[in-house]
Amino acid sequence: MVNMKASMFLTFAGLVLLFVVCYASGSEEKEFPKEMLSSIFAVDNDFKQEERDCAGYMRECKEKLCCSGYVCSSRWKWCVLPAPWRR
């Protein structure tokens, strides 16, 4: 099961890379592949830099309040889903 997931992920990543290379080779701009790859990897950095007023799932809640739908675990100080079996 794990091997199937890994092979599907690698196949998908290969197809995306093939698309980027083919699209870049058809483009007249020589800097396009670098710009395309940097914009793809910059999206991840944008999400990391985005600050929230509340802490999401499994985020530290010592200084911030948890977002709606989550509660601060008294034992671990992480935002978790509320459950009837938790104290």
UniProtKB/Swiss-Prot annotation:
Q: InterPro entries recorded for this chain?
A: Huwentoxin-1 (IPR011696), Huwentoxin_CS1 (IPR013140)
The cross-references to Pfam families, in alphabetical order and at most eight, read: Toxin_12
Query: How is expression of this protein distributed across tissues?
Result: Expressed by the venom gland.
Q: Where is the signal peptide?
A: 1-24
Q: Which GO terms describe its cellular component?
A: extracellular region
Quoted from the entry, the domain comment is: The presence of a 'disulfide through disulfide knot' structurally defines this protein as a knottin.
Q: What is this protein called?
A: U3-theraphotoxin-Hhn1a 8
Specify the species.
Cyriopagopus hainanus
